[in-house]
Amino acid sequence: MRGCLQSVRWLTTALRRPAPQLSCLPFQPFASTSRLFSSCASRAATAARKPPSELEQRIAAIPIERFRNFCIVAHVDHGKSTLSDRLLELTGTIEPGSNKQVLDKLDVERERGITVKAQTCTMLYNYKGEDYLLHLVDTPGHVDFRAEVSRSYASCGGALLLVDASQGVQAQTVANFYLAFAQGLELVPVINKVDLPSADPDRALDQMKSSFELDVEQAVLVSAKTGLNVKQLLPTIVEQIPAPVGDHTKPLRVLLVDSWYDTYKGVILLIRVFDGEIKAGDQVVSFATGKKYIVGEVGIMYPNQTPQTVLRAGQVGYVYFNPGMKQSQEAKIGDTYTKVGSEKLVEPLPGFEEPKAMVFVAAYPVNSDDFPHLEESINQLLLNDRSITVKKESSEALGGGFRLGFLGTLHCSVFQDRLQQEHGANIIITPPSVPCKILWKSGEETVITSPIDFPDDDSSRMKVEEFQEPYVLTTLTFPQEYLGKVIELCEGNRGEQVSLEFFTATQVILKYQLPLAQLVDDFFGKLKGLTKGYASLDYEESGWRKSNIVKLKLLVNKVPVDAVSRVVHTSQVARLGRQWVTKFKEHVDRQMFEIVIQAAVGNKIVARESVKPFRKDVLAKLHASDVTRRRKLLEKQKEGRKRLQAVGNVIIEHKAFQAFLSK
């Protein structure tokens, strides 16, 4: 009883006390937007007021004259990521031998040994008693990710031009050199893999001198794998690569270089600060969208996200907003940001050219019930890669799916791997196709990306003036001994020779105009096979050309299978049609009636195969001499099969489509 009375007294006393003043108030419906905006900004600024770390104090003491922003540029598999690891180890950013390919963060990058996303890292290097702030960008080498490379150059003042001592200058070395040269980057020649038995550094240096007119006397010969001579690179970077230009006293001007999505923080932006300073609590505005944001956190990649109090002019780092940017479409690559109120004082920076999808595939879930999961998985990956185009599509054979556009075939393959590895999506992918342009007699133009939309009936084709397909200018480098075979391959793929150059006694640079449709049809695989893996390839868009293209369809019992249709050149129709019907026959189960598989262009059948039906022995119980009864039963069975074929649906398992569409 006494305990109950004490509880009542305690409760009465508590109720008489004044309510505590809460520091963080709940949502007030009558509060003005500006009050809420300023209160969020003040809270973010208060949260950012922490004592600076030793790293921050060292960075704060470094003037912009001792900043160096650089990237590593090379052909695929010439050792960019391995060299990045050695530089990070030498500057104390990571522990020696702690990780391989630190900047290759995706599983597919580690598995394939390639770089897909450009990654950044900040390093501190003490040279002659003074600290230098080095900012490294590890760029992709493959042509499909050219947009990643060109964006990376915008945040750099120089580049290490890396060449494999055993392979020499390759096609993408040439392409990436011209990209860097056009942006005015200071180039430092570096020869890698000098420890290999097949290494020939002198030949590689001669190629760099003759191809790029670089001063090879300043070249550094290294082995990124063993660490040989890598220490000599750091003084070379400090002495040869210029400091960034910027003024931290001017109004804020930052360039959005890249972005990625974080589940908890929303969209995180990778920025290059050209002028001014940016810190948590600042209110910034986008020139592209006009939307305003409050900076929640700024920091550098060291090599992971490391928060900082402020980012100054010349630095490259990350920023995310509070409240977070939830729609990745708001983060437009190449956009300029400044502080609210400084819009008229700042000239926006020139942006980047938007990458265009050049290769299209259709993706369908193996199980139609998994469509929502596939859609969610694709949307998650799009947050980190907005160069992919997505359009919903429906197929009678495979159900709901998506028409996806990519920068190239490797880009498509990497996306498929990420869907399966990171999201467990089990999908059916159609062979890659390219867009085509239709010029109508009415004067209109239409670009179609799906074979389903291609006009193949007579009435539609009568309205067409001409069809066009995209061409690319390809640059191939390979040993001279394979010249005849490579020319034969290019000519067999409707190519037109542009130039032929012997840039050393044994190496050839061959340029061809090729239809993009031929290039995506495993051209690179055939090229590698012909040259025993010694060839390299690079390409760039070369416009549209008139072409005699048609839509090739697959018919099963006279019903078109829309998921398998494809736009091809007339010279390929007979060969491809024969391949289709032969391969599809292997994967279709027998039915109670005959299945006719045909390849057709319009109303013309170009190839045919048939799957024989199961046969029931209706004569088993008859006497051998009963000829009349025997004939009657056989005729009845024949009529029954005709009726079944007329009304029966051919059941084709999804596994059959998956096997047929695979290489």
Swiss-Prot record:
Coiled coil: none annotated. GO terms for molecular function: GTP binding; GTPase activity; mitochondrial ribosome binding. InterPro entries: EF-4, EFG_III/V, EFG_V-like, EFTu-like_2, G_TR_CS, LepA_C_sf, LepA_CTD, LepA_IV. It is found in: Mitochondrion inner membrane. The keyword NADP does not apply. It is an enzyme of class 3 (hydrolase). It holds the Pfam family LepA_C. It catalyses: GTP + H2O = GDP + phosphate + H(+). Keywords: GTP-binding, Hydrolase, Membrane, Mitochondrion, Mitochondrion inner membrane, Nucleotide-binding, Protein biosynthesis, Transit peptide. Residues 65-245 form the tr-type G domain. Its EC number is 3.6.5.-. GO terms for biological process: positive regulation of translation; translation. It is a peripheral membrane protein. GTP binds at residues 74-81, 138-142, 192-195. Residues 1-44 form a transit peptide. Its main location: mitochondrion. GO terms for cellular component: mitochondrial inner membrane; mitochondrial matrix. Belongs to the TRAFAC class translation factor GTPase superfamily. Classic translation factor GTPase family. LepA subfamily. HAMAP family: LepA (MF_00071). Promotes mitochondrial protein synthesis. May act as a fidelity factor of the translation reaction, by catalyzing a one-codon backward translocation of tRNAs on improperly translocated ribosomes. Binds to mitochondrial ribosomes in a GTP-dependent manner. This is Translation factor GUF1, mitochondrial. It comes from Coccidioides posadasii (strain C735).
